[in-house]
Every structure is written in structure tokens, then in C-alpha cells.
Amino acid sequence: MVSEYIDSELKRLEDYALRRVKGIPNNRRLWVLTCMDERVHIEQSLGIQPDDAHIYRNAGGIVTDDAIRSASLTTNFFGTKEIIVVTHTDCGMLRFTGEEVAKYFISKGIKPTEVQLDPLLPAFRISSEEDFIKWFKFYEDLGVKSPDEMALKGVEILRNHPLIPKDVRITGYVYEVETHRLRKPNQIIYNETSKFEHGTIVKE
């Protein structure tokens, strides 16, 4: 009956709209941290749909204080049981340093110690130019040399953070913008295959 179909759709739409009120988690109980780079097609690479996960993006896919804020909320109150950290090749956070960016803003007349970083926390201010440089969190300033290292570092930080439940599964991957594929950190298949001129003979 048409009326039964309509009633069923209305119920489905109501449940969808009231997910938070009814305590319904996202479809995969998943939170993803990745870079804001538009070349990272995160849903496609993970094989997920828009309703399957909470997606958090920032410059570099770095575990910042705000990333931790979101991760702690989704895992403690929204039913999330898995976190995936995805960095990517050719990331802009590898191309500059915090010092270069800080100098740019200073040349524009910005005074680091007078910058209000969080409008909701007026007391949270940078106390020195050095802290201003660190605040941008470019890979080099964090002692990180590759997206692989950053993915592993992000996983480690989240696993050891007191606001993230210990039963949450946390893994990291690297998205290759050249191939549009994910891989595990430090597992570069292309480099391995390119070492050999001939394939290995398969033995029976």
C-alpha cells in the first residue's frame, strides 16, 4: 500500500533527523581525521557514504587541541568506536615552516602576542613569537619528515590521550594523491615493485 510506504519513509526521515536526540550513532561508528586538501577524496578512499562517519578536516590532518575536542565528544557521547587518521602525499604542511608563515603575518603588521586565537577563549593568547611559530604546527616544526610519520604520530597521540576511551580502535593511513589510494604508513608498494626488472617466478 502507498500509505504504508509513506509512513515508513516518514519514520525513516524522523529517525535520521533525530539521530542525536535518540542516541543513534553514525552508520559505521567512525570518526575520521584528515587534511583539508581537496585532493583527498576521503569517503571514496574509505569506501564509505556521507552518513557513515564524522569527518574532521584541518591543515595537515594533524591531531590539534580542537581535533581532540571533537574526537573526545564523538567517542564518549555519540557512540563512535573507531578512529582513522589519514594524512597524504604532497601535503602543503611539508612545504613551509611555521617561521616562514609567522614572518609573513608579521610583515603585514600582525603582532603575535596580540592575536586572539580562539574568540570563545579570550584569555588564550600566544605569549611569544616562538609560540606563534609552533601554533601553526607545520610538519618540520613538529620534527616530522613525511606523511607516514605524521599518521603514526597522530595515532600514538590519540591512543595515549586520557579523553579517548581505551576500547576505541585507532589506525592510520596515507592517501596517495598520485594514485588516489590508501596505504599503510611506510608501506610504499610502488617503490618496492620498481626495484626489479623482472617479476618473481611463481613456484608450484
Curated annotation (Swiss-Prot):
Cofactor(s) needed: Zn(2+)
InterPro entries named in the record: Carbonic_anhydrase, Carbonic_anhydrase_sf
Protein name: Carbon disulfide hydrolase
Catalysed reaction equations from the record: carbon disulfide + 2 H2O = 2 hydrogen sulfide + CO2 + 2 H(+)
Residue sites binding Zn(2+) per the record: 35, 88, 91
EC numbers for this chain: 3.13.1.5
Biological function: Catalyzes the conversion of carbon disulfide into hydrogen sulfide and carbon dioxide, with carbonyl sulfide as an intermediate. Likely plays a key role in sulfur metabolism that allows Acidianus sp. A1-3 to grow on carbon disulfide as the main carbon and energy source. Does not show carbonic anhydrase activity (hydration of CO(2) to carbonate).
Cofactor note: Binds 1 zinc ion per subunit.
Any one GO MF annotation of this record: zinc ion binding
Cysteines joined through disulfide linkages: none
Subunit structure: Forms a hexadecameric catenane homooligomer, through interactions of two interlocked octameric rings. Exists as both octamers and hexadecamers in solution.
GO biological process, one term: hydrogen sulfide biosynthetic process
This protein's UniProt keywords: Hydrolase, Metal-binding, Zinc
SMART domains per UniProt: Pro_CA
Pathway named in the protein's UniProt entry: Sulfur metabolism; hydrogen sulfide biosynthesis
Protein family according to the UniProt entry: Belongs to the beta-class carbonic anhydrase family.
Enzyme's top EC category: hydrolase
The organism's place on the tree of life at top rank: Archaea
